[in-house]
Amino acid sequence: MEMGAEKMLASILEPLRDRYDFVIVDTCPSLGSLTINALAAADEVMITVNPQLLAMMGLQDFIRTVKKVRNRLNESLRIAGILLTMCDARTNLCKVITEQVMEAFEGQIRIFESVIPNTVKVGESIYYSKPLVEYAPGSKVCEMYRSLAREVADYEGE
């Protein structure tokens, strides 16, 4: 990576700050250069957690990375909260990981009340190149994303 490359996205997004209330950058679940760029450019980060066996280790690693980025590249970076995604509430693993997240971070990091369920609707909407609100507007997953949007808007208004 060339020098200063971790600030490339920040310089591209800077002119947009006055035009938009929110700019959302969705990165893949890795700690590669795109994720570091997104963290260097962000005011806040919403950490998504897929309740699988290695989720807690990955969550701890990501929080450490956020702290490093805050110390080295973006001192104003804040954690907006933790969002549980791809959850199947019928499984014990989902329940256990959700409880672990609550026990480990409640009172330290906001845990969003909205929980995004695991469903084929998301993948189908991507396949058909349609926003979820058009492809499956009445679905549970769409309602949870609406709920999350309300939570974020209410949080920003505080």
Predicted regions and their residues:
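Short, conserved glycine- and acidic-residue-centered signature motifs
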Residues: 2, 55-58, 141
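Short glycine-rich substrate-engagement loop in P-loop NTPases that contacts/grips substrate
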Residues: 1-9
